[in-house]
Design a protein with these regions (language model features):
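Outer membrane beta-barrel transmembrane domains
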Residues: 319-321, 325-375
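N-terminal periplasmic/intermembrane-space "pro-region" immediately following the signal or transit peptide
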Residues: 4-11, 15-57, 193-195, 404
Length: 404
């Protein structure tokens, strides 16, 4: 049944609806580059725009891991993945050509392999209601990922989106996370009546680290083994800026409600078919920012795996930020995840607090956060120990960011 739904979904691409981020000539998803930042080369008519930009982040990290039930005789290190890091050293340029084609190319020097090319896309806007975007860019799923990278409330996205899921099968290749992030593909999108946005896309489904065509046809469904994704939003007060805190936007009154779905056909080394769905809410009201999301993932194995089990996972979070002064923003988040599937008892609950300081007239931003990962409702101590494997119980992070 699912394969017919996906085929119908693909055939109806021009008619589908899903969420839209604010479209500007300098939109890039990394930093806000409005006319007050950096410099821009513009033609006299304004139909050609070229704008370079940069984002540099340096972090100091402390992570404390639970013993996970191991005896002290193993002499395991509780403190790991601690020290300094550069998660992003981004250099890119964005712009507009012929008055209707926007483009963006971004390299992340802090990454390796295929992740070096963070983004590379062009977007042909035929009219406000219809545009075509091609290349490597953010997939239309979750407010947390679609927020401008340099304007997130906390220096890491919710763990419920990034943590790999747990299932009782020894298939090392099958460790899907709920979040999808960057990918290669094509999407159509537009804005209807200044309030309704849509994005519908087809992607490789292999993530940001792969820049080549590696997919095949599904043996079970006989359709291309790709990621089919769509997102629909309603913005009752006009287009919602893709920010979770910007000192230049302290008088906004915007709101967004969104729904998204996707199916990754023969993902995880052709082992599974992964269905995802999500609901999101975000709001900017003067000095307040509020965001909340809930998402679900269904994992079913391909016939070649000869595994009849299916697994369902979900996660959710709510977060808020408030500018106490024009430069100081306080932040809090509560994150939940059913990491070991709905078939087993137990949840991860992850409260976090943070503070952000924006240095005036410098484009410098200082962020600090603390997160605790708790475990509740597990049937056995072994389940409790396994549920947060690879995840730190205590996380403290300080991030200094410069944008240009």
């Amino acid at each position: 049944m699912k394969k017919y739904i996906i085929l119908a979904f693909t055939a109806m691409l021009p008619l589908a609806a899903a969420a839209q981020q604010e479209e500007e000539a300098t939109e890039n998803g990394i930093v806000s580059v409005d006319g007050t930042k950096g410099f821009t080369i513009t033609s006299k008519k304004g139909d050609f725009v070229f704008k370079p930009y940069a984002l540099i982040q340096t972090t100091a990290n402390f992570n404390y891991y639970d013993d996970e039930g191991l005896d002290k005789a193993y002499n395991q290190d509780n403190v790991a993945n601690t020290g300094f890091a550069i998660p992003y050293a981004v250099l890119g340029f964005t712009g507009k050509a012929f008055g209707r084609v926007t483009f963006n190319l971004t390299m992340n020097a802090a990454a390796s392999g295929g992740n070096l090319l963070q983004q590379a896309w062009f977007d042909v806007k035929l009219k406000e209601q219809f545009a075509i975007k091609v290349g490597k860019f953010k997939t239309p799923f979750t407010h947390a990922y679609l927020t401008t990278l340099g304007e997130t409330l906390l220096p890491q996205v919710p763990t419920s989106l990034t943590a790999t899921t747990i299932m009782p099968h020894t298939l090392n290749a099958v460790t899907p996370a709920i979040g999808t992030g960057f990918d290669l593909g094509v999407e159509i999108h537009g804005l209807l009546a200044k309030k309704f946005g849509y994005e519908v896309g087809i992607f490789n489904g292999t993530g940001a680290s792969v820049n080549t065509a590696t997919k095949t046809f599904s043996d079970d469904w006989h359709i291309p083994s790709l990621l089919y994704s769509a997102r629909l939003t309603w913005m009752p007060k006009g287009v919602m800026p893709s920010t979770q805190g910007n000192p230049n936007r302290l008088h906004e009154d915007k709101m967004l409600f969104g729904l998204s779905v996707s199916e990754n056909v023969e993902s995880e080394s052709e082992s599974t078919n992964d269905f995802r769905a999500g609901f999101e809410f975000s709001m900017l009201k003067d000095r307040w920012y509020v965001g909340a999301e809930a998402y679900y993932m269904h994992v079913g194995f391909t016939k070649r795996q000869k595994i009849d089990d299916t697994f369902n996972y979900w996660g959710a979070y709510a977060q808020a930020g408030y500018f106490v002064t024009n430069q100081l923003q306080l932040a809090a988040r509560y994150d939940f995840m059913d990491r070991n599937s709905t078939g087993k008892d137990g949840l991860l609950n992850m409260p976090a607090v943070g503070v952000n300081y924006f240095f005036p007239n410098t484009n410098l931003k200082l962020q600090a956060m603390y997160q605790y990962i708790g475990r509740t409702g597990h049937a056995t101590q072994l389940d409790r120990d396994n549920d947060d494997l690879g995840q730190p119980m205590h996380t403290a992070k300080v991030l200094l960011q410069y944008t240009f």
